Protein backbone atom coordinates (compact mmCIF):
# COMPACT_ATOMS: atom_id res chain seq x y z
CA UNK A 1 0.00 0.00 0.00
CA UNK A 2 1.23 3.47 -0.91
CA UNK A 3 1.29 6.05 1.88
CA UNK A 4 0.05 9.60 1.49
CA UNK A 5 2.80 12.14 0.92
CA UNK A 6 3.76 15.36 2.68
CA UNK A 7 3.94 17.34 -0.55
CA UNK A 8 0.55 18.82 -1.37
CA UNK A 9 1.00 18.76 -5.15
CA UNK A 10 1.96 15.07 -5.12
CA UNK A 11 -1.25 14.16 -3.29
CA UNK A 12 -3.41 16.29 -5.60
CA UNK A 13 -1.85 14.83 -8.74
CA UNK A 14 -2.18 11.28 -7.40
CA UNK A 15 -5.90 11.73 -6.65
CA UNK A 16 -6.59 13.34 -10.03
CA UNK A 17 -4.61 10.71 -11.94
CA UNK A 18 -6.27 7.75 -10.22
CA UNK A 19 -9.75 9.20 -10.73
CA UNK A 20 -9.25 10.40 -14.29
CA UNK A 21 -12.36 9.88 -16.45
CA UNK A 22 -14.48 9.58 -13.30
CA UNK A 23 -17.18 12.20 -13.78
CA UNK A 24 -18.54 11.65 -10.26
CA UNK A 25 -15.21 12.50 -8.60
CA UNK A 26 -15.12 16.02 -7.16
CA UNK A 27 -12.00 17.71 -5.75
CA UNK A 28 -12.09 21.19 -4.24
CA UNK A 29 -8.80 22.98 -3.53
CA UNK A 30 -8.79 25.65 -0.81
CA UNK A 31 -6.71 27.18 1.97
CA UNK A 32 -7.06 27.12 5.75
CA UNK A 33 -4.80 28.66 8.37
CA UNK A 34 -2.34 29.76 5.71
CA UNK A 35 -1.85 26.24 4.32
CA UNK A 36 -3.23 24.70 1.16
CA UNK A 37 -5.72 21.84 1.41
CA UNK A 38 -8.28 19.99 -0.65
CA UNK A 39 -11.58 18.18 -0.13
CA UNK A 40 -12.45 15.09 -2.21
CA UNK A 41 -15.90 13.48 -2.48
CA UNK A 42 -17.84 11.22 -4.83
CA UNK A 43 -20.91 12.94 -6.25
CA UNK A 44 -24.11 11.14 -5.31
CA UNK A 45 -22.61 9.36 -2.30
CA UNK A 46 -22.51 12.34 0.08
CA UNK A 47 -25.03 14.80 1.50
CA UNK A 48 -24.16 18.17 -0.06
CA UNK A 49 -25.82 20.12 2.75
CA UNK A 50 -23.80 18.34 5.43
CA UNK A 51 -20.64 18.78 3.36
CA UNK A 52 -21.00 22.55 3.35
CA UNK A 53 -22.36 23.13 6.84
CA UNK A 54 -20.54 20.52 8.90
CA UNK A 55 -17.18 20.17 7.15
CA UNK A 56 -16.10 22.75 4.60
CA UNK A 57 -17.54 25.77 6.43
CA UNK A 58 -16.02 25.01 9.85
CA UNK A 59 -12.65 23.89 8.43
CA UNK A 60 -12.14 26.83 6.07
CA UNK A 61 -13.35 29.35 8.65
CA UNK A 62 -11.26 28.00 11.51
CA UNK A 63 -8.79 30.36 13.18
CA UNK A 64 -6.17 27.79 14.08
CA UNK A 65 -2.71 28.84 15.20
CA UNK A 66 -0.27 26.00 14.78
CA UNK A 67 3.45 25.87 14.10
CA UNK A 68 3.42 22.56 12.20
CA UNK A 69 1.00 20.97 9.72
CA UNK A 70 0.57 17.98 12.03
CA UNK A 71 -0.47 20.20 14.92
CA UNK A 72 -2.91 22.10 12.70
CA UNK A 73 -4.34 18.82 11.42
CA UNK A 74 -4.97 17.57 14.96
CA UNK A 75 -6.60 20.84 16.03
CA UNK A 76 -8.93 20.81 13.03
CA UNK A 77 -9.85 17.23 13.70
CA UNK A 78 -10.45 17.89 17.38
CA UNK A 79 -12.36 21.18 17.32
CA UNK A 80 -13.78 21.97 13.88
CA UNK A 81 -15.24 18.90 12.27
CA UNK A 82 -18.76 17.96 13.44
CA UNK A 83 -19.10 14.56 11.76
CA UNK A 84 -19.82 11.57 14.00
CA UNK A 85 -17.81 9.25 11.77
CA UNK A 86 -14.35 10.80 11.96
CA UNK A 87 -11.27 8.75 11.08
CA UNK A 88 -7.75 8.99 9.72
CA UNK A 89 -6.33 7.37 6.60
CA UNK A 90 -2.60 6.96 6.08
CA UNK A 91 -2.60 5.23 2.68
CA UNK A 92 -4.15 6.08 -0.66
CA UNK A 93 -6.01 2.75 -0.67
CA UNK A 94 -7.69 3.50 2.66
CA UNK A 95 -8.55 7.03 1.55
CA UNK A 96 -10.08 5.73 -1.69
CA UNK A 97 -12.11 3.12 0.18
CA UNK A 98 -13.62 5.75 2.48
CA UNK A 99 -14.11 8.09 -0.48
CA UNK A 100 -16.27 5.52 -2.26
CA UNK A 101 -18.14 4.72 0.96
CA UNK A 102 -19.67 8.19 1.24
CA UNK A 103 -16.89 9.92 3.20
CA UNK A 104 -15.29 13.30 2.54
CA UNK A 105 -11.49 13.09 2.35
CA UNK A 106 -9.55 16.14 3.62
CA UNK A 107 -5.81 16.47 2.93
CA UNK A 108 -3.64 19.26 4.38
CA UNK A 109 -0.36 20.45 2.90
CA UNK A 110 2.61 19.03 4.79
CA UNK A 111 0.63 16.30 6.57
CA UNK A 112 1.12 12.68 5.37
CA UNK A 113 -2.36 11.50 6.37
CA UNK A 114 -5.96 12.33 5.51
CA UNK A 115 -9.00 13.13 7.59
CA UNK A 116 -12.08 11.19 6.48
CA UNK A 117 -15.56 12.27 7.58
CA UNK A 118 -18.77 10.31 7.06
CA UNK A 119 -21.54 12.31 5.40
CA UNK A 120 -23.28 9.56 3.44
CA UNK A 121 -26.25 10.67 1.38
CA UNK A 122 -26.83 8.11 -1.35
CA UNK A 123 -30.24 6.94 -2.52
CA UNK A 124 -31.45 3.81 -0.77
CA UNK A 125 -34.53 1.64 -0.65
CA UNK A 126 -36.96 2.01 2.22
CA UNK A 127 -37.57 -0.87 4.57
CA UNK A 128 -40.40 -2.82 2.96
CA UNK A 129 -42.32 -6.04 3.44
CA UNK A 130 -40.18 -9.14 2.74
CA UNK A 131 -41.01 -10.88 -0.54
CA UNK A 132 -39.38 -14.28 -0.07
CA UNK A 133 -40.52 -14.78 3.56
CA UNK A 134 -44.05 -13.44 3.63
CA UNK A 135 -46.14 -13.96 6.74
CA UNK A 136 -49.76 -13.50 7.79
CA UNK A 137 -48.99 -12.18 11.25
CA UNK A 138 -45.98 -10.49 12.78
CA UNK A 139 -43.62 -7.77 11.62
CA UNK A 140 -43.57 -6.52 8.03
CA UNK A 141 -39.99 -5.24 7.75
CA UNK A 142 -37.00 -6.68 5.96
CA UNK A 143 -33.34 -5.96 5.43
CA UNK A 144 -32.20 -3.59 2.68
CA UNK A 145 -29.08 -3.28 0.52
CA UNK A 146 -27.15 -1.04 2.94
CA UNK A 147 -25.15 -2.98 5.51
CA UNK A 148 -25.22 0.00 7.89
CA UNK A 149 -29.02 0.11 7.78
CA UNK A 150 -29.13 -3.64 8.31
CA UNK A 151 -26.91 -3.33 11.37
CA UNK A 152 -29.29 -0.71 12.73
CA UNK A 153 -32.35 -2.92 12.08
CA UNK A 154 -30.69 -5.80 13.90
CA UNK A 155 -29.54 -3.60 16.78
CA UNK A 156 -33.08 -2.25 17.14
CA UNK A 157 -34.33 -5.81 17.52
CA UNK A 158 -31.60 -6.92 19.93
CA UNK A 159 -31.00 -4.23 22.54
CA UNK A 160 -28.09 -5.94 24.25
CA UNK A 161 -24.38 -5.22 24.51
CA UNK A 162 -23.75 -8.91 23.86
CA UNK A 163 -24.62 -8.38 20.18
CA UNK A 164 -21.29 -8.00 18.40
CA UNK A 165 -20.99 -6.68 14.85
CA UNK A 166 -17.45 -7.40 13.64
CA UNK A 167 -16.71 -5.78 10.26
CA UNK A 168 -14.11 -7.01 7.78
CA UNK A 169 -13.30 -6.13 4.18
CA UNK A 170 -13.46 -8.74 1.42
CA UNK A 171 -12.32 -8.29 -2.16
CA UNK A 172 -8.86 -7.51 -3.47
CA UNK A 173 -9.91 -5.25 -6.36
CA UNK A 174 -12.99 -3.60 -4.83
CA UNK A 175 -13.21 -4.11 -1.03
CA UNK A 176 -16.73 -4.82 0.20
CA UNK A 177 -17.86 -4.43 3.83
CA UNK A 178 -18.89 -7.74 5.38
CA UNK A 179 -20.17 -7.91 8.96
CA UNK A 180 -20.13 -10.90 11.32
CA UNK A 181 -23.06 -10.73 13.75
CA UNK A 182 -23.20 -12.91 16.86
CA UNK A 183 -24.01 -12.89 20.56
CA UNK A 184 -20.81 -13.34 22.53
CA UNK A 185 -22.68 -15.01 25.41
CA UNK A 186 -24.54 -17.46 23.13
CA UNK A 187 -22.30 -18.28 20.17
CA UNK A 188 -19.25 -20.49 20.64
CA UNK A 189 -15.95 -18.69 20.09
CA UNK A 190 -14.75 -21.60 17.93
CA UNK A 191 -17.72 -21.15 15.60
CA UNK A 192 -17.13 -17.40 15.26
CA UNK A 193 -13.43 -17.93 14.52
CA UNK A 194 -14.17 -20.68 11.99
CA UNK A 195 -16.64 -18.48 10.08
CA UNK A 196 -14.29 -15.50 10.11
CA UNK A 197 -11.38 -17.61 8.88
CA UNK A 198 -13.46 -19.06 6.03
CA UNK A 199 -14.40 -15.55 4.94
CA UNK A 200 -10.80 -14.37 5.04
CA UNK A 201 -9.79 -17.38 2.93
CA UNK A 202 -12.26 -16.26 0.23
CA UNK A 203 -9.86 -14.61 -2.21
CA UNK A 204 -12.33 -12.75 -4.41
CA UNK A 205 -11.82 -9.66 -6.53
CA UNK A 206 -15.10 -8.25 -5.23
CA UNK A 207 -18.25 -9.47 -3.49
CA UNK A 208 -21.17 -8.55 -5.74
CA UNK A 209 -23.76 -10.75 -4.02
CA UNK A 210 -24.15 -12.98 -0.99
CA UNK A 211 -24.17 -16.08 -3.20
CA UNK A 212 -20.45 -15.67 -3.87
CA UNK A 213 -19.71 -16.33 -0.19
CA UNK A 214 -21.94 -19.39 0.19
CA UNK A 215 -19.40 -21.88 -1.28
CA UNK A 216 -16.78 -20.68 1.20
CA UNK A 217 -19.13 -21.03 4.18
CA UNK A 218 -20.93 -24.21 3.14
CA UNK A 219 -19.50 -27.41 4.59
CA UNK A 220 -22.04 -29.59 2.69
CA UNK A 221 -20.94 -28.76 -0.85
CA UNK A 222 -21.08 -32.44 -1.89
CA UNK A 223 -24.63 -32.85 -0.63
CA UNK A 224 -28.04 -31.75 -1.87
CA UNK A 225 -28.58 -29.87 1.39
CA UNK A 226 -26.87 -26.60 2.23
CA UNK A 227 -25.33 -25.78 5.60
CA UNK A 228 -25.88 -22.04 5.05
CA UNK A 229 -29.23 -20.41 5.75
CA UNK A 230 -30.53 -17.15 4.30
CA UNK A 231 -33.10 -14.69 5.58
CA UNK A 232 -34.22 -11.15 4.86
CA UNK A 233 -36.11 -10.71 8.13
CA UNK A 234 -34.50 -9.06 11.20
CA UNK A 235 -36.82 -10.94 13.57
CA UNK A 236 -35.87 -14.32 12.12
CA UNK A 237 -32.16 -13.49 12.28
CA UNK A 238 -32.49 -12.34 15.90
CA UNK A 239 -34.00 -15.69 16.88
CA UNK A 240 -31.20 -17.56 15.09
CA UNK A 241 -28.54 -15.53 16.90
CA UNK A 242 -30.15 -16.37 20.24
CA UNK A 243 -29.63 -20.02 19.30
CA UNK A 244 -25.88 -19.44 19.13
CA UNK A 245 -25.49 -19.07 15.38
CA UNK A 246 -23.30 -16.64 13.46
CA UNK A 247 -24.67 -14.34 10.74
CA UNK A 248 -22.91 -12.69 7.80
CA UNK A 249 -24.23 -9.36 6.49
CA UNK A 250 -22.97 -8.29 3.06
CA UNK A 251 -23.07 -4.80 1.58
CA UNK A 252 -25.35 -4.57 -1.47
CA UNK A 253 -27.80 -7.38 -0.69
CA UNK A 254 -30.89 -7.60 1.54
CA UNK A 255 -30.25 -11.28 2.29
CA UNK A 256 -28.27 -12.31 5.36
CA UNK A 257 -26.42 -15.61 5.71
CA UNK A 258 -26.24 -17.59 8.94
CA UNK A 259 -24.56 -20.83 10.02
CA UNK A 260 -24.95 -23.58 10.95
CA UNK A 261 -28.18 -24.31 9.08
CA UNK A 262 -29.89 -27.55 10.10
CA UNK A 263 -32.42 -29.76 8.32
CA UNK A 264 -35.27 -28.82 10.68
CA UNK A 265 -34.75 -25.11 9.89
CA UNK A 266 -36.25 -25.71 6.44
CA UNK A 267 -39.66 -26.38 7.99
CA UNK A 268 -39.79 -23.45 10.41
CA UNK A 269 -41.51 -20.19 9.54
CA UNK A 270 -42.41 -17.10 11.51
CA UNK A 271 -46.15 -17.78 11.47
CA UNK A 272 -45.62 -21.10 13.25
CA UNK A 273 -44.86 -19.19 16.44
CA UNK A 274 -47.86 -16.87 16.15
CA UNK A 275 -50.39 -19.68 15.84
CA UNK A 276 -51.76 -21.63 18.82
CA UNK A 277 -49.57 -24.67 19.60
CA UNK A 278 -52.08 -27.21 18.28
CA UNK A 279 -52.41 -25.46 14.91
CA UNK A 280 -48.71 -24.59 14.72
CA UNK A 281 -47.90 -28.26 15.26
CA UNK A 282 -50.37 -29.28 12.55
CA UNK A 283 -48.79 -26.88 10.06
CA UNK A 284 -45.31 -28.14 10.97
CA UNK A 285 -46.32 -31.77 10.33
CA UNK A 286 -47.97 -30.68 7.10
CA UNK A 287 -44.64 -29.28 5.90
CA UNK A 288 -42.79 -32.54 6.56
CA UNK A 289 -45.57 -34.47 4.81
CA UNK A 290 -45.42 -32.09 1.84
CA UNK A 291 -41.66 -32.57 1.60
CA UNK A 292 -42.16 -36.34 1.39
CA UNK A 293 -44.84 -35.94 -1.29
CA UNK A 294 -42.76 -33.55 -3.39
CA UNK A 295 -39.71 -35.85 -3.37
CA UNK A 296 -41.15 -39.37 -3.45
CA UNK A 297 -44.69 -39.26 -4.94
CA UNK A 298 -43.73 -39.18 -8.66
CA UNK A 299 -41.16 -41.93 -8.17
CA UNK A 300 -43.61 -44.14 -6.25
CA UNK A 301 -46.29 -43.63 -8.92
CA UNK A 302 -43.88 -44.52 -11.72
CA UNK A 303 -42.60 -47.59 -9.83
CA UNK A 304 -46.12 -48.87 -9.10
CA UNK A 305 -47.37 -48.24 -12.63
CA UNK A 306 -44.33 -49.86 -14.26
CA UNK A 307 -43.38 -52.83 -12.05
CA UNK A 308 -45.93 -53.32 -9.27
CA UNK A 309 -49.39 -53.01 -10.83
CA UNK A 310 -50.69 -55.66 -8.39
CA UNK A 311 -50.38 -53.13 -5.56
CA UNK A 312 -52.75 -50.66 -7.24
CA UNK A 313 -56.52 -50.98 -6.57
CA UNK A 314 -58.35 -52.44 -9.56
CA UNK A 315 -60.54 -49.43 -10.37
CA UNK A 316 -57.57 -47.07 -10.17
CA UNK A 317 -55.49 -49.45 -12.27
CA UNK A 318 -58.12 -49.43 -15.04
CA UNK A 319 -58.17 -45.61 -14.97
CA UNK A 320 -54.39 -45.41 -15.26
CA UNK A 321 -54.24 -48.09 -17.96
CA UNK A 322 -56.91 -46.44 -20.11
CA UNK A 323 -55.12 -43.08 -19.86
CA UNK A 324 -51.68 -44.49 -20.61
CA UNK A 325 -52.89 -46.68 -23.49
CA UNK A 326 -53.25 -43.59 -25.70
CA UNK A 327 -49.82 -42.11 -24.92
CA UNK A 328 -46.63 -42.95 -26.86
CA UNK A 329 -44.28 -42.58 -23.87
CA UNK A 330 -43.61 -44.73 -20.85
CA UNK A 331 -44.66 -43.58 -17.39
CA UNK A 332 -41.08 -42.64 -16.49
CA UNK A 333 -40.57 -40.58 -19.63
CA UNK A 334 -43.95 -38.91 -19.19
CA UNK A 335 -43.11 -37.89 -15.62
CA UNK A 336 -39.67 -36.57 -16.57
CA UNK A 337 -40.99 -34.65 -19.57
CA UNK A 338 -43.83 -33.10 -17.55
CA UNK A 339 -41.50 -32.08 -14.72
CA UNK A 340 -39.00 -30.52 -17.10
CA UNK A 341 -41.76 -28.60 -18.84
CA UNK A 342 -43.04 -27.41 -15.46
CA UNK A 343 -39.56 -26.18 -14.47
CA UNK A 344 -39.25 -24.32 -17.79
CA UNK A 345 -42.62 -22.69 -17.23
CA UNK A 346 -41.71 -21.74 -13.65
CA UNK A 347 -38.38 -20.26 -14.71
CA UNK A 348 -40.07 -18.24 -17.44
CA UNK A 349 -42.61 -16.91 -14.96
CA UNK A 350 -39.81 -15.85 -12.59
CA UNK A 351 -37.66 -14.05 -15.17
CA UNK A 352 -40.41 -12.20 -17.01
CA UNK A 353 -42.06 -9.05 -15.63
CA UNK A 354 -44.73 -9.83 -13.05
CA UNK A 355 -47.71 -9.04 -15.28
CA UNK A 356 -46.41 -11.17 -18.15
CA UNK A 357 -45.19 -13.86 -15.77
CA UNK A 358 -48.68 -14.47 -14.42
CA UNK A 359 -49.98 -14.79 -17.98
CA UNK A 360 -47.30 -17.38 -18.80
CA UNK A 361 -48.22 -19.41 -15.71
CA UNK A 362 -51.91 -19.39 -16.59
CA UNK A 363 -51.31 -20.31 -20.23
CA UNK A 364 -48.87 -23.06 -19.31
CA UNK A 365 -51.01 -24.56 -16.58
CA UNK A 366 -54.40 -24.49 -18.31
CA UNK A 367 -54.02 -24.26 -22.07
CA UNK A 368 -50.88 -26.31 -22.69
CA UNK A 369 -51.65 -28.83 -19.95
CA UNK A 370 -55.13 -29.52 -21.30
CA UNK A 371 -53.89 -29.59 -24.89
CA UNK A 372 -51.17 -32.17 -24.22
CA UNK A 373 -53.65 -34.49 -22.50
CA UNK A 374 -56.22 -34.07 -25.30
CA UNK A 375 -53.55 -34.75 -27.92
CA UNK A 376 -52.55 -37.95 -26.15
CA UNK A 377 -48.96 -36.89 -25.47
CA UNK A 378 -49.30 -37.51 -21.72
CA UNK A 379 -51.94 -39.10 -19.52
CA UNK A 380 -54.21 -37.19 -17.18
CA UNK A 381 -53.11 -39.17 -14.05
CA UNK A 382 -49.45 -38.20 -14.44
CA UNK A 383 -50.46 -34.57 -14.90
CA UNK A 384 -52.40 -34.70 -11.63
CA UNK A 385 -49.44 -36.32 -9.84
CA UNK A 386 -47.01 -33.67 -11.09
CA UNK A 387 -49.42 -30.87 -10.17
CA UNK A 388 -49.76 -32.20 -6.60
CA UNK A 389 -45.99 -32.58 -6.41
CA UNK A 390 -45.38 -29.03 -7.64
CA UNK A 391 -47.78 -27.51 -5.12
CA UNK A 392 -46.34 -29.58 -2.25
CA UNK A 393 -42.79 -28.48 -3.11
CA UNK A 394 -43.70 -24.86 -2.31
CA UNK A 395 -44.81 -25.66 1.24
CA UNK A 396 -41.20 -26.18 2.37
CA UNK A 397 -39.80 -23.61 -0.04
CA UNK A 398 -36.21 -23.43 1.32
CA UNK A 399 -35.75 -27.00 0.08
CA UNK A 400 -37.09 -26.32 -3.41
CA UNK A 401 -33.69 -26.46 -5.14
CA UNK A 402 -32.86 -29.81 -3.55
CA UNK A 403 -36.34 -31.23 -4.14
CA UNK A 404 -36.28 -30.33 -7.85
CA UNK A 405 -33.26 -32.56 -8.46
CA UNK A 406 -34.08 -35.30 -5.97
CA UNK A 407 -37.52 -36.08 -7.40
CA UNK A 408 -36.02 -36.53 -10.88
CA UNK A 409 -33.52 -39.00 -9.42
CA UNK A 410 -36.28 -40.90 -7.63
CA UNK A 411 -38.35 -41.03 -10.84
CA UNK A 412 -35.36 -42.63 -12.56
CA UNK A 413 -34.90 -45.05 -9.66
CA UNK A 414 -38.59 -46.00 -9.66
CA UNK A 415 -38.80 -46.29 -13.45
CA UNK A 416 -35.68 -48.44 -13.81
CA UNK A 417 -35.64 -50.61 -10.67
CA UNK A 418 -39.11 -50.30 -9.12
CA UNK A 419 -39.80 -50.03 -5.41
CA UNK A 420 -36.57 -51.83 -4.55
CA UNK A 421 -34.41 -49.15 -6.10
CA UNK A 422 -36.70 -46.51 -4.65
CA UNK A 423 -36.22 -47.86 -1.12
CA UNK A 424 -32.45 -48.00 -1.61
CA UNK A 425 -32.52 -44.39 -2.78
CA UNK A 426 -34.54 -43.34 0.26
CA UNK A 427 -32.10 -45.11 2.55
CA UNK A 428 -29.16 -43.40 0.85
CA UNK A 429 -30.88 -40.03 1.21
CA UNK A 430 -31.55 -40.52 4.93
CA UNK A 431 -27.99 -41.72 5.51
CA UNK A 432 -26.66 -38.66 3.71
CA UNK A 433 -28.79 -36.30 5.83
CA UNK A 434 -27.75 -38.00 9.07
CA UNK A 435 -24.05 -38.09 8.16
CA UNK A 436 -23.68 -34.35 7.61
CA UNK A 437 -22.19 -32.29 10.42
CA UNK A 438 -21.85 -28.60 9.47
CA UNK A 439 -19.50 -26.76 11.82
CA UNK A 440 -19.50 -29.71 14.20
CA UNK A 441 -23.31 -29.78 14.63
CA UNK A 442 -25.28 -32.81 13.32
CA UNK A 443 -27.37 -31.64 10.37
CA UNK A 444 -30.31 -33.85 11.39
CA UNK A 445 -30.22 -32.80 15.06
CA UNK A 446 -32.18 -33.19 17.26
CA UNK A 447 -33.72 -36.07 15.26
CA UNK A 448 -30.42 -37.89 14.74
CA UNK A 449 -28.86 -38.28 17.22
CA UNK A 450 -32.22 -38.33 18.96
CA UNK A 451 -32.78 -35.81 21.74
CA UNK A 452 -36.39 -36.02 22.90
CA UNK A 453 -36.13 -32.89 25.07
CA UNK A 454 -35.23 -30.79 22.01
CA UNK A 455 -38.03 -32.07 19.75
CA UNK A 456 -40.46 -29.43 21.00
CA UNK A 457 -39.71 -27.22 17.99
CA UNK A 458 -39.19 -29.84 15.27
CA UNK A 459 -42.19 -32.02 14.32
CA UNK A 460 -44.54 -29.99 16.47
CA UNK A 461 -44.40 -26.74 18.40
CA UNK A 462 -44.68 -26.56 22.16
CA UNK A 463 -46.22 -23.60 23.94
CA UNK A 464 -44.06 -20.54 24.59
CA UNK A 465 -44.06 -21.28 28.31
CA UNK A 466 -42.02 -24.42 27.57
CA UNK A 467 -39.98 -23.04 24.68
CA UNK A 468 -38.84 -20.07 26.76
CA UNK A 469 -37.35 -22.43 29.35
CA UNK A 470 -35.60 -24.55 26.70
CA UNK A 471 -33.81 -21.92 24.64
CA UNK A 472 -31.36 -24.43 23.20
CA UNK A 473 -28.07 -23.35 21.64
CA UNK A 474 -26.76 -25.26 18.65
CA UNK A 475 -23.61 -26.25 20.55
CA UNK A 476 -25.81 -27.86 23.25
CA UNK A 477 -27.50 -30.28 20.84
CA UNK A 478 -26.62 -33.92 21.34
CA UNK A 479 -23.69 -34.95 19.16
CA UNK A 480 -22.46 -31.38 18.61
CA UNK A 481 -18.70 -30.79 18.70
CA UNK A 482 -18.24 -27.10 17.96
CA UNK A 483 -14.62 -27.29 19.11
CA UNK A 484 -13.93 -29.54 16.11
CA UNK A 485 -15.46 -27.25 13.48
CA UNK A 486 -13.19 -26.03 10.73
What does each model-found stretch correspond to?
Residues 300, 313-486:
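Generic detector of multi-pass transmembrane helix bundles and their immediately adjacent loops
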Residues 291-311:
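Hydrophobic alpha-helical segments embedded in or immediately adjacent to the lipid bilayer
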Residues 1-296, 314, 434-486:
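Membrane-embedded alpha-helical signal segments
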